Amino acid sequence: MLTCEMRESALARLGRALADPTRCRILVALLDGVCYPGQLAAHLGLTRSNVSNHLSCLRGCGLVVATYEGRQVRYALADSHLARALGELVQVVLAVDTDQPCVAERAASGEAVEMTGS
């Protein structure tokens, strides 16, 4: 059974992970499947070392896992439940602030979508 302290610790780790826009961008990218740090860096327009630092934080928070393939490391969300939970969390946040359309909806409509973060 989860104690209050365990729940608080889990929420604090999640909050730490989501507090940084770059980590949020990495999590969103990983919703599409496993990636190598170099792929994430190229996709997000960041340096590989920056991405690696953020991936280290996300691993420490328990949100991503690393799989070693020789000298390369690929990253994925830690659990399929996490992918669903992140999707639900986004929907809840958007439901609270209805003036902020979903990025995917804006992109589908042809509206320019700017992704920020470093």
UniProtKB/Swiss-Prot annotation:
- Cysteines engaged in disulfide bonds, as pairs: none
Note whether Cytoplasm occurs among the keywords: no
Which CDD domains did the record assign? Answer: HTH_ARSR
Domain of life according to the entry: Bacteria
User: From its record, what is one biological process in GO terms?
Assistant: response to cadmium ion
Residues that bind Cd(2+), according to the entry?
A: 57, 61, 102
The entry's keywords: Cadmium, DNA-binding, Metal-binding, Transcription, Transcription regulation
Which Pfam families does the record cross-reference, listed alphabetically?
HTH_5
Record keyword Nuclease present: no
Name the PROSITE patterns on file: HTH_ARSR_2
- Report the InterPro entries cross-referenced here: ArsR-like_HTH (IPR011991), HTH_ArsR_DNA-bd_dom (IPR001845), HTH_Metal-responsive_Reg (IPR052543), WH-like_DNA-bd_sf (IPR036388), WH_DNA-bd_sf (IPR036390)
GO molecular-function term, one example from the UniProt record: cadmium ion sensor activity
Location of the HTH arsR-type domain: 3-97
Note the subunit structure. Homodimer.
Question: What role does it play?
Answer: Metal-responsive transcriptional repressor for the cmt operon. Binding of cadmium or lead causes the repressor to dissociate from the DNA.
Recorded protein name is: HTH-type transcriptional regulator CmtR
Origin species, per record, is Mycobacterium tuberculosis (strain ATCC 25618 / H37Rv)
Could you tell me the gene encoding this protein?
cmtR
